A protein has these predicted regions:
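Short alpha-helix in the alpha/beta-hydrolase fold that links the catalytic acid
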Residues: 234, 248-257
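Hydrolase active-site cap/lid region
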Residues: 27, 32, 162-209
């Protein structure tokens, strides 16, 4: 009996050893403060779901006609002072591109609840933002496009298949695999520091099955974006960070090509993480930002 306890203790120690010796540090994104940017408050209805949405409109200086990009939020609660969003917004605004950054439903000044909403419901928030630009804003825009950030990359093609007013899509660290495949990849990364990778791969599917039943995840479980992407006939830019630990970048690129979507602009920034953040400065990668405004300004349909 004592021998069995000793053996079990040794096994536990071996399994916990990676947790003892590994150190994973976390840093917050570097970027501008909201107070440093010039914007206007807006309010617009989502008539599809009977809720009111708030947001911010960032206009470029001294430019009468301009492209306008609508940001689509990533997962979870969203706040206006999110420096990942603001870094992208600030760069676009400085380079002659207007940005409409809605408050995510249930966050800041927007009604509704993102928990329990599926992607089709969340897509109506973006469609409503586009409706606002066309019908109420009095803006002299040259074209309207979508910038889906992380989870927003799953929502963007839904909006574009239902609106003929969209001229371009940017998917920034957005997965082209299914939601469950993305979650499984992320779970392996989250579990792996506490044990060995082969065990993490065994444990991850169990965690995924549990998460599938959670209120915040069950409405989007099993979602596959490819059927939507295959309907898109406008310019698309998929941007990935090569060191992204939230989604399987190689699998995402392979899947796009496997479904004959290689005509989309697809670029991986080798040192970028999720959100295409520079690993040293923890700012959004400048090469990506330059590619972003070039893509938007050069897009013609």
């Amino acid at each position: 009996m004592k021998k069995a306890i000793i053996i079990i203790g040794i096994l536990i120690l071996i399994l916990l050893l990676p947790y003892v010796i590994k150190d994973r540090s976390y840093r917050s994104t570097n970027g501008p403060e909201l107070s440093e940017l010039k914007y206007s408050e807006i309010v617009f209805p989502n008539n599809y779901e009977n809720i009111q949405l708030g947001g911010m409109l960032f206009l470029p200086e001294a430019k009468d006609t301009f492209p306008i990009a609508v940001i689509i939020h990533g997962s979870g609660r969203s706040r206006r002072n999110n420096k990942w969003y603001l870094s992208t917004v600030s760069h676009l605004q400085r380079n002659g591109i207007a940005v409409l950054l809605p408050d995510k439903r249930g966050c800041e000044k927007s009604e509704g609840a993102w928990i329990g909403s599926d992607f089709e419901q969340l897509a109506t928030d973006t469609k409503s933002a586009v409706d606002y630009i066309i019908n109420e804003s009095n803006l002299h825009y040259s074209k309207i496009g979508l910038v889906g950030m992380s989870q927003g990359g799953w929502i963007a093609p839904i909006v574009a298949t239902e609106s003929s007013d969209i001229s371009f899509i940017v998917s920034m660290s957005g997965a082209s695999v299914t939601t469950d495949e993305q979650l499984d990849f992320e779970m392996v990364y989250n579990i792996e520091p506490y044990t060995y990778k082969f065990l993490a791969r065994l444990i991850a599917p169990i965690s995924v099955r549990q998460i599938r039943n959670k209120d915040y995840y069950s409405p989007i479980a099993g979602f596959d974006p490819i059927p939507y992407w295959k309907q898109i006939r406008i310019p698309v830019f998929f941007a990935f960070g090569g060191n992204d630990t939230n989604l399987p970048v190689d699998d995402c690129v392979k899947r796009l090509k496997a479904h004959n979507l290689e005509h989309f602009k697809i670029k991986t920034y080798p040192n970028g993480g999720h959100g295409i953040l520079d690993p040293e400065t923890y700012k959004v990668n400048q090469e990506f930002l330059n590619d972003l405004d070039d893509f938007i300004n050069e897009t013609n349909i």
